[in-house]
Regions:
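Lumenal/extracellular "mature" regions of secretory-pathway glycan-modifying transferases
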Residues: 2-256, 261, 276-427
Length: 427
């Protein structure tokens, strides 16, 4: 029996497909062992991990919601709208680690910074485009613009954010952004109280005497900073009807609004929403002030802050009520997961960290807690611990480099395909 020889064009096509497949596989699986080994869910990595596994309830004892979570598929398309001084840097690290493990594509700013056009509304020109590749995650500072986000992100994207008690958030922002120094009242005994003696006069004096180009970005957060991040225009800060409508809009458009004061509870809600594992949400706190920089506020000052940032207060009160409604409907498994998360976090701190350190934050003189990784860890554990301490800027640099390589690989493959198409009849 004589076998017919395949046409030369078909042979070339088959070889080409094999080459392209090999390149793609090489790109996505070619990380070093160090890059691939930072999952931290094994028993030996976490003190008490074996007991946690052995003490799990039997399948027959688990609630229906946990069974549904077990069957669901992990969601990988997420917009995390960062708000200022709400614990969002910690959550960003969680998303960054998950995205790296799962080889997801991130929205990366065009400039070498950690902001996507903020304080301006997010626009497509604020991000690096990777041809026809849709990003999976956005978790850099940006100002909420749903119309543009809908064009940029996949249709099934999950939208989440986090807010905080507006009094604590304002006090933290005032300190972190060094508003006392910017506004020329740092020489006062208490710059925060000095500001609230007459905030409008302080701001008018600043406008008349200072170069507005220098610190104007920061001062966008001097009033209703969280709602500003979430898209409310400053002209509407005193319009209660517009505030109410915008709160309802955010309620419709966001799948979850977390609360900093209930951080672990929020993370378990996030885990269940995204169908992730507890190991995906372990964390070290990022961007925290030293305790010595924190202060207690008088009742009078609390009232003034609430009146000054009344839009933020309305925002927080609304979503706090919704949060507690969700909390009241949780099963015992939900609260067990909180306990497991805290145990894992404590174990990782003990295993990974020698001690916390202090370093200056993004804004000059404010001291922020940092991390010192223990020595004599295994290489895999050292990498795992180290990635948990990476701040947003470091991760963005990593993604910017990694995704540039992805773009170059894609363009090389397209060039190869176009070249072959000039002499291989594919039809």
């Amino acid at each position: 029996m004589i076998r017919k020889r395949l046409p030369k064009s078909v042979t070339v096509l088959v070889v080409t497909i094999c080459i392209i497949s090999a390149i793609i596989v090489k790109f996505y699986s070619g990380e070093s062992a160090k890059e691939k080994s930072f999952t931290i869910s094994t028993e030996q990595d976490i003190p008490g991990g074996k007991n946690l596994i052995e003490n799990k309830p039997r399948e027959s004892q688990k609630g229906q919601k946990q069974e549904e979570t077990k069957r669901c598929k992990p969601k990988k398309n997420v917009v995390f709208l960062k708000t200022h001084k709400t614990g969002s840097s910690t959550i960003t690290n969680i998303f960054n680690r998950f995205g790296e493990r799962n080889k997801l594509v991130f929205v990366v700013p065009t400039e070498k910074q950690n902001r996507l056009g903020w304080p301006w509304f997010f626009q497509e020109e604020h991000m690096i485009h990777y041809d026809k590749i849709k990003p999976n995650m956005l978790c850099s500072h940006s100002r909420y613009n749903r119309e543009v986000l809908d064009r940029v992100m996949p249709e099934d994207t999950v939208y989440v954010t986090i807010i905080r008690d507006p009094v604590a958030q304002f006090e933290s922002t005032f300190s972190y952004m060094t508003f006392g120094e910017i506004l020329g009242i740092s020489n006062k005994t208490d710059p925060l109280e000095a500001f609230f003696e007459n905030p409008k006069d302080v701001l008018v004096n600043y406008i008349l005497t200072q170069d507005l180009r220098i610190n104007s970005d920061r001062l966008k957060l001097i009033r209703n900073g969280m709602f500003f991040d979430l898209g409310l225009e400053s002209k509407d800060f005193d319009n209660m009807e517009d505030i109410r409508q915008n709160i309802q809009r955010l309620d419709r458009e966001f799948h979850l609004v977390m609360l900093m004061e209930y951080f672990d509870e929020s993370l378990i809600m996030l885990k269940n929403l995204l169908c992730w594992d507890i190991e995906d949400i372990v964390y070290f706190h990022h961007n925290q002030r030293k305790e010595t920089h924190k202060r207690n506020l008088t009742n009078k000052l609390v009232t003034r802050i609430e009146q000054w940032s009344s839009a933020d207060k309305a925002l927080y009160d609304y979503f706090k009520t919704l949060f507690f409604q969700k909390l009241s409907n949780q099963t015992p498994d939900f609260f067990r997961d909180i306990s497991v998360l805290r145990t894992k976090n404590a174990g990782l701190r003990d295993r990974c960290l020698d001690f916390t350190t202090e370093h200056n934050g993004d804004y000059q003189d404010v001291e922020i807690q940092g991390f010192k990784i223990k020595k004599n860890l295994t290489k895999a554990m050292e990498t795992s611990c180290d990635k948990m301490t990476w701040n947003e800027v470091k991760y963005l640099g990593y993604f910017r480099y990694k995704q540039k390589k992805l773009l170059e690989t894609t363009e090389s493959l397209r060039t190869l395909w176009d070249y072959l198409a000039t002499f291989v009849p594919f039809t």
